[in-house]
Amino acid sequence: MTVDVIAHIRTDLTDKFGVPRQSGLVPELGGTIVLEPPYRNPDALRGLEGFSHLWLIFQFHRAARAEWSPTVRPPRLGGNRRMGVFATRSPFRPNAIGLSCVKLEEVRLDEKLGPVLYVSGADLVDGTPILDIKPYLPYADCHPEATGGFTDPLSAQKLEVSCDPALLAGLAPRQREALLGVLACDPRPRYQDDPERVYGLSFAGKNVRFTVEKGVLTVLAVE
C-alpha cells in the first residue's frame, strides 16, 4: 500500500517538547493546513465547511524507529510503568501514524497556496505531514459513556501558571493564551520534578524558559 502526504500543518510549536499530549487540551492553539499541490483542488473540500471538527490522520515524522516494542512507557505514568503499545497513543508504533481531532475554524479557498484550512486545538508539531482529513461525525464519533482506562485519573491534572504579562508582549493575543495553555498542561516528563531545573521550549519563534515547584509553573523569560 502506498500512502501519500496530502498536506502539512503549520503550528507555533517547532519542537516535540511542549506539544500537548492530546488534541483539544489547548483550544487556543491554532494551526494552518496547507495542501500539497496535487490536492489543491477546491472540489476536494466541497461541503467541509459544514462540519465543526475534523479528524487528522498524520505521520509521527519525528518518532520513526527501525524496530517497534510491544510495550512503551507513557510519560503520564512517570516513565517507569509499561503499557501495551496498543493501549496507548505513543508515537513509537509499528506504523508511525497518529489521529488528532481538531476544530475547523475556517476554510479559505483563495489563498496563495490554494485552499487552506485554519484549525484549532491541534497537538501537532510544526510541519507534521497529514495523510488524510475526515469530518468528525457527532452521531457516530461521540461516546459519552466511554472510559479511559489508566488515563482517567490523569485527565484533569493542570498546573497553575505564573507569568508577568510583560513577558508576553511579543506575542499576538491568541498566541499568549495558547502558550499559557501549553504550559498549564505541564510539558515536562513525569519523572522530572526538580524545582531548581530551568526548562525551555520553543513557541512562535520564542525561547520560553520556566521552572515548576509545588504545582506552580513560573515563566522566567520569553525571548
Task: Please give the residue ranges for each predicted region.
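Conserved positions in beta-strands of structured domains
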Residues: 10, 102-105
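Mixed-charge, low-complexity intrinsically disordered regions
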Residues: 1-97, 109-118, 122-223
